[in-house]
From Swiss-Prot:
One cellular component term from this protein's GO annotations in UniProt: plasma membrane
UniProt xrefs under InterPro entries: NADH_Q_OxRdtase_suD, NDH1_su_D/H, NiFe-Hase_large
Pfam families (alphabetical): Complex1_49kDa
Function: NDH-1 shuttles electrons from NADH, via FMN and iron-sulfur (Fe-S) centers, to quinones in the respiratory chain. The immediate electron acceptor for the enzyme in this species is believed to be a menaquinone. Couples the redox reaction to proton translocation (for every two electrons transferred, four hydrogen ions are translocated across the cytoplasmic membrane), and thus conserves the redox energy in a proton gradient.
Location relative to the cell: Cell membrane
Catalytic activity annotation: a quinone + NADH + 5 H(+)(in) = a quinol + NAD(+) + 4 H(+)(out)
Subunit structure: NDH-1 is composed of 14 different subunits. Subunits NuoB, C, D, E, F, and G constitute the peripheral sector of the complex.
Gene that specifies this protein: nuoD
Domain of life: Bacteria
Family: Belongs to the complex I 49 kDa subunit family.
Lineage, highest ranks first: Bacteria, Bacillati, Bacillota, Bacilli, Bacillales
An example Gene Ontology molecular-function term: NAD binding
Protein name, UniProt field: NADH-quinone oxidoreductase subunit D
EC number: 7.1.1.-
Length: 366
């Protein structure tokens, strides 16, 4: 008589494929996952509580360290919340610089996902190509704000610095180059039979599951839900650009892959149009006091980050620090469907599924 015993395995918190200090406790029977329990909190720093003792401008660097692969969108959401409370009108040139910074950051973030996800399942070359192009974007953002990862660029009322001479032209040159490389990525990976066998039909969930788990971003759109805040609830100047929202139909790892790859192309369209419409001159920061005091009241805003819907709630008592601040962090919500996705899957698919959800632990733990 053959008898099998279930085994407990720890994936992380120091596993290279968890891309951060994330621990996953799995129970396996042979090679089949029976149960998966995420363990989070290793990177918790209490950002929201710390913010209660900081001035609004001082909070911005802390947002860089949540989703550190897409710091510009985090910068924007806190500024947008305060601006909403104050009723500020943002200068045109600042709006375009914000959009350019956020969309370049979105492309860079998706490049990290593409390269590392493929590296995790055994493809080394794409990782090198992805980081080659990402380095070009990081250099552009470095020229803009003097930092490579934690930018601290946005300000309540606009941005800290104007674009340096020749920067817009460099961004314009980058767009056709990136399109050419993107076509090469598809030639290299998207039609590869081995890759397709690893992602098609793996990690499937329904539209109903996605909505009930509060998923957002590509993790929601892969099921066929056409929802992107840049289109459905336009903020900043996104209503001035012509772009479409990629959606899937099956809700598997392949659909999540396709959605993000197509999002890179759509972000390139936005960048291209923003460069063409970029104002020749103008202020980059509205007239705001050095010490900002939001009026008494509360506000909630939400925007579309590379990982999904990031929100910021502020309650103000009229002082220079927020009375209460709360972030809706998309990675935290997207992570919650992982136990459902992994149950019954082969252990070989674990890393494929985890990489497809695309979490950032700085954002999960907050």
């Amino acid at each position: 008589m053959i008898r099998t015993e279930e085994m407990l395995l720890n994936v992380g918190p120091q596993h290279p494929s968890t891309h951060g200090v994330f621990r996953l406790v799995i129970k396996i029977d042979g090679e089949i996952i029976k149960e998966a329990t995420p363990v989070i909190g290793y990177l918790h720093r209490g950002t929201e509580k710390i913010a209660e003792s900081l001035q609004y401008t001082q909070i911005i660097p802390y947002t860089d360290r949540m989703d550190y692969l897409s710091a510009m969108t985090n910068n924007y959401v806190i500024c947008h919340a305060v601006e909403t409370m104050m009723g500020l009108e943002i200068p045109e040139r600042a709006e375009y610089l914000r959009v350019l910074a956020m969309e370049l950051g979105r492309i860079a973030s998706h490049l990290v996902w593409w390269g590392t996800n493929l590296l995790d399942i055994g493809a080394v070359s794409p990782f090198l190509y992805a980081f080659r192009e990402r380095e070009m974007i990081i250099n552009l953002l470095n020229e803009l704000c003097g930092a490579r990862l934690t930018f601290n660029y946005m300000r309540v009322g606009g941005v800290k610095w104007d674009a340096p001479d020749g920067w817009i032209e460099k961004v314009e040159e980058f767009v056709p180059y990136m399109r050419e490389q993107l076509a090469g990525y598809h030639d290299l990976v998207s039609g590869n039979e081995i890759f397709l066998n690893r992602v098609k039909g793996v990690g499937i969930y329904s539209e109903e599951d996605a909505i009930s788990y509060s998923l957002s971003g590509a993790n929601l759109r892969c099921t066929g839900v056409n929802w992107d805040l840049r289109k459905d609830e336009p903020y900043s100047i996104y209503d001035r650009f012509d772009f479409h929202i990629p959606v899937g139909s099956v809700g598997d790892a392949w659909d999540r892959y396709v959605c993000r790859m197509q999002e890179i192309e759509e972000s390139l369209k936005i960048v291209e149009q923003a460069v063409q419409q970029f104002p020749k001159e103008g202020a980059v920061l509205a007239k705001v006091p050095k010490i900002i005091k939001a009026p008494k009241g509360e506000a909630f805003v939400r925007i579309e980050s590379p990982r999904g819907e990031i929100g910021c709630y502020i309650a103000s008592d009229g002082k220079k620090e927020p009375y209460r601040l709360k972030f809706r962090r998309p990675s935290f919500y997207n992570l919650q469907i992982l136990p459902k996705l992994l149950k019954g899957e082969n252990i070989a698919n674990l890393i494929t599924i985890l990489g497809g959800v695309d979490i950032v632990l700085g954002e999960v733990d907050g």
